[in-house]
Amino acid sequence: MMLSRPKPGESEVDLLRFQSQFLEAGAAPAVQLVKGSRRRGDAHPDQLPPQDHRDVVMLDSLPDLPPALLPAPSKRARPSPGRPLPHDEDPEERLNRHDEHITAVLSKIVERDTSSVTVTLPVPSGVAFPPVFHRSQERQVKPAASSKRSIFAQEIAARRVSDNRAPSAEQVVPSPDAPEGAVPCETPSSKDRGSQLPGRSHSFHRPNLITGKGLRSQAAVQEVQTIHEENVARLQAMDPEEILKEQQQLLAQLDPSLVAFLRAHNHTREQTETKATKEQNPERPSVPVSKEEPIMSTCTGESGTRDKLEDKLEDKLQPRTPALKLPMTPNKEWLHMDTVELEKLHWTQDLPPLRRQQTQERMQARFSLQGELLEPDVDLPTHLGLHHHGEEAERAGYSLQELFHLTRSQVSQQRALALHVLSHIVGRAQAGEFGDRLVGSVLRLLLDAGFLFLLRFSLDDRIDSVIAAAVRALRALLVAPGDEELLDSTFSWYHGASVFPMMPSHDDKEDEDEDEELTKEKVNRKTPEEGSRPPPDLARHDVIKGLLATNLLPRFRYVLEVTCPGPSVVLDILAVLIRLARHSLESAMRVLECPRLMETIVREFLPTSWSPIGVGPAPSLYKVPCAAAMKLLRVLASAGRNIAARLLSSFDVRSRLCRFIAEAPRDLALPFEEAEILTTEAFRLWAVAASYGQGGDLYRELYPVLMRALQTLPPELSTHPLQPLSMQRMASLLTLLTQLTLAASTQPEATSGSVESCVVAIPSSITWTHVSGLKPLVEPCLKQTLKFLRRPDVWNALGPVPSACLLFLGAYYQTWSQQSGLCPEDWLQDMERFLDEFLLPLLSQPPLGRMWDSLRDCSPLCNPLSCASTPEALPSLVSLGCAGGCPPLSVAGSASPFPFLTALLSLINTLGQIHKGLCRQLAVVLTAPGLQNYFLQCVAPAPAPQLTPFSAWALRHEYHLQYLVLSLAQKAATSQPEPAASTALHHVMALVLLSRLLPGSEFLAHELLLSCVFRLGFLPENASGGPEAADFSDGLSLGNSGDPHCRRGALLVQACQDLPSIRSCYLAHCSPARASLLTSQALYRGELPRVSSLLLPVPKEPLLPTDWPFQPLIHLYHRASDTPSGLPAADTVGITMRVLQWVLVLESWRPEALWAVPPAARLARLMCVYLVDSELFRETPIQRLVAALLARLCQPQVLPNLKLDCPLPGLTSFPDLYASFLDHFEAVSFGDHLFGALVLLPLQRRFSVTLRLALFGEHVGVLRALGLPLAQLPVPLECYTEPAEDSLALLQLYFRALVTGALHARWCPVLYTVAVAHVNSFVFCQDPKSSDEVKAARRSMLQKVWLLADKDLRQHLLHYKLPNSSLPEGFELYPQLPRLRQQYLQTLPTEVLQNGGFKT
């Protein structure tokens, strides 16, 4: 139905009819009214109002399973109907709407609506031109009443009007005598004249402080004036001296800061008035002060006393500063120069002259914009921008405090500049440039000040330049220069891919041991204590953990995915991620599992197709292959086999490997250097995956590519000069082939059915037929490299290529020998051929001998200072400290022989293990003079290098070489009928190495215990008269023992016969934990399916303690302490006897192995033999062994080193152990002489008096059973009697024990002699320096001795002369007292002498 529109002439009746027809028709209106939104203005006309839908729950649509226990998503505000959701909005429009930059303001220019502006026509005037507009005239015009101005603006305007108002004619009285150009002064009015004090120059026109602004009444001004007049009246009634006194009293009561503020306020006001007066007469020049003085005197009358008092007081309170002179005279007409604020213009002055430091006081360090440390007296020009700071403005450079303050600036450029300077400072500190020029550590100071979290907060900035600066500073802090280069260059070494985690090794109660097979649930599940610790506490112990707790990884993901920064920022972020992945397995898992982080990196920086990149820096790294991204994947894969499997499967890394390896570096359409590094990292990533037995299918696909790459190696090696990047690529390719060859070996059988040892072995996709043709291609490479052995410069340029060739051949022969279906004669003949063609000519070359000679120069053990930590090393931030690279003569230097010799020894051991007939020919290596000299220096008594991150890394590679030499020596010993001359040296080296091996080398320690340490062939003394020599030595020093079975020679012979039992005992108590042993065994044997990670355990300490020969005895002691009922006698006697036998062998023939154990620690371990059981010491074998070991401790050359006062390893307190020993002796000894000898040994005079006080004070009952004869005392008697005792408390205990009869010569001859000697020396001492208390005690004790009823004891105490153990009494006596002693006795009181009745 069409309704016609109203036509002209129709009335309202027609309109009402049309409306009723429309309503009856029910048609939709042509226009719809919509209520506009208050927040967004008018709504869209085409948008329908939202309909009210109800939520209806349908049972059929409900799921069958209960919902997962996942946290509900965070609630968000529901948008209004007229406001689209953020995800429906164009991102560009959203960014434009939220953009607050100044450019956004300038780009949105809206023309102002002038339709409502009133247009005022010009006023008709008879002047041809309008008057010139002056700004001063505008100020004098009163504002319209209708205009609204703020109170503050009105006050400022009124103040300006009052200041600019010129004085009236009657107020200005020019001086008749004033010269031309003099400044007229103001004459006070009649009202002000009444407020002027007589005889004073100051008039009080109005109150200075009380203004009445806070009063709301209309009479506020009158009230203020009344108060002012009262104050003036009181001041007029006071003398100047009283005013000054009251002023001083008031100033003493007020706050100095308030006084300073009031003075500054008054000074500013007076200065403003003076300048306003001068500005009213701009045509007159200013007059010097000297010419103004008489004029002012004429104007004001007489000089004011109060001015002099004021000036005197001002000089006392604050020094006067020179007035600031402006370079021009300010004009009143200038904009904003009506009031000159001089305090704000001080910065325009020239800098004061630099003050030279005359003392040695410490000064605040200042740095340049490049992070250089500036000298305190350096004078630099100001245009360099190094003087824009407040404190010490004359000194150039910025302090750390000022840079921290600048990072909080509102100007983004200043924040970025401060972060850049801080990053330069951190980088130079990491590089060791500051050295000893600074007190303390810069990095420690920065971290304590919160630098880490300052960088984290800066990452959340909205400005790209600030983010870039923060990322660069974070990289400078976390990534030490040289660390990554060192680890990359040694990747192809012998087990070079296995590294220690770069996490702090210090103990922390919140740190938990990480399991090798760390699952995702365990990584995500934190302990309540660690989860509740704030990031600053975590960062104090571990910087990386503290950073990860601040959601650093999601922020990195946002920066990479959303902001798309430049190449430098991308490389910095990747470097930081690599450092985080090296921290631990937990950190690597967190990097891997950060949402969309790895996906973004793989998608953006490892694409499979890209546009060709020209020479020069790339504008962007996005959609371009990046070698750093590939390295990140490799480091993540090194953390665990699960991570490597996920990278290969979930992130499509297989296709990336195929893409980057299939083409040669020169064909990758990338810069040559970047292409070389990218291919190298691809080889390394594949090698890491192959270390777990993964990636075998890629080998079949890329087999032609690898063969072609191998064939090109010899020609590349013959070109000169050799490129370091190419050498690293070749070595990485050979390392990859080594791991692939090991993957083709037969899977070993599980050693047991336990869970930790039984790993489900997936059959390898690589078989022997796939790798059998690799050796003919690698041997030409080795032959080509060995040609350069006589040219050191070319040999050093080869890098790890020769080592990688040797390691590949060792893996090849090992895998070949494990093929059960092949004829052994084939590989045995090939080994003989290889020996004749390669090894024997190599071993006879002089350059190889020079390599053995250079071992000492490059050894960390022989040069402990080379492993010393840097001054900037932090325990919470692990770094290898390789700033500036390694020196050539170091373990990782370019001239280091360690990588090649270690690989050569590994190959020789493999050949000797497979072909026993080659051992004698290969043993020629052991006779190298340089190797023997190196071993002699390694076993020499010297302090071990401090265990730092770099020393742990370097020592691990050095221990590999030492172990391989010992393994070869063990193989050679089995094939030689007579022991070699260096056998004893090799045995000492094995003993020393066993106590030095670090975590991760559990398999090596176990092999040493099995093969070298307890091997009878490594003890040539047993067959060459060693026992007889021991008996002869003991006979010369101690006298011949009656029982031949008690002699040391017989005990040594018995110990050599019991070596298998001794080895079983130590294997049971000193072997590493089974789980760690199996992990290490899989790594060193090449059992790839059982390798769980290439991250080694944290090197907190060596695997075995330095006193490992006593470890079974210590375990037995702890078991006995925890078992009150006692241990089985058979186990106790057997373990104790084996330990004592082995310790006796080491004491006699291998004292170098016990140099690290001090004699006091050995004595404490012997005392544990008696504390284990109450009957153990009665066993005859135990007594003989303990007596022999005690005799070794009491030798004249060992006894001076027996120090019981210093801290002992493994012992908290020797006095506590000795107290327990006395209790045990008193309870179970029954006067055993050997037991008593151990009790007496710590009572020597040079040891602590605490031990003697414990015996004579708390364990006097021990004296009754301590019946060791003087002839059996293992040390000279003079060790107990000399020097004289100086402890008064102990002397009194001696005397009390003698007088009471607790100490007698019949049951305790040794201590009886000691007590008599010290008491006699004390009572007859006439030292004038003694205190009054000592003199009184001495006189009292002498009187008591004189009055003793026991004539024998009195005779001994008075006539004692010298100790003599050959006499029955143990000492000599004076037949008659010397004259001096007789005279001293005459000083006693007469009654004492008469009562004594003793004749001298």
Swiss-Prot record:
GO terms for cellular component: DNA-directed RNA polymerase complex; nucleus. The modification Phosphothreonine is found at residue 329. InterPro entries: ARM-type_fold, RNA_pol_II_AP1_C, RNA_pol_II_AP1_N, RPAP1/Rba50. The lineage of its organism: Eukaryota, Metazoa, Chordata, Craniata, Vertebrata. Residues 35-54, 60-95, 161-215, 269-310, 504-539 are annotated as: Disordered. This is RNA polymerase II-associated protein 1. Part of an RNA polymerase II complex that contains POLR2A, POLR2B, POLR2C, POLR2D, POLR2E, POLR2F, POLR2G, POLR2H, POLR2I, POLR2J, POLR2K, POLR2L, RPAP1, FCP1 plus the general transcription factors TFIIB and TFIIF. Forms an interface between the RNA polymerase II enzyme and chaperone/scaffolding protein, suggesting that it is required to connect RNA polymerase II to regulators of protein complex formation. Required for interaction of the RNA polymerase II complex with acetylated histone H3. GO terms for molecular function: DNA binding; nucleotidyltransferase activity. It comes from the Eukaryota. Belongs to the RPAP1 family. It is found in: Nucleus. Residues 39-54, 85-95, 269-282, 519-539 have a biased composition (Basic and acidic residues). It comes from Rattus norvegicus. GO terms for biological process: transcription by RNA polymerase II.
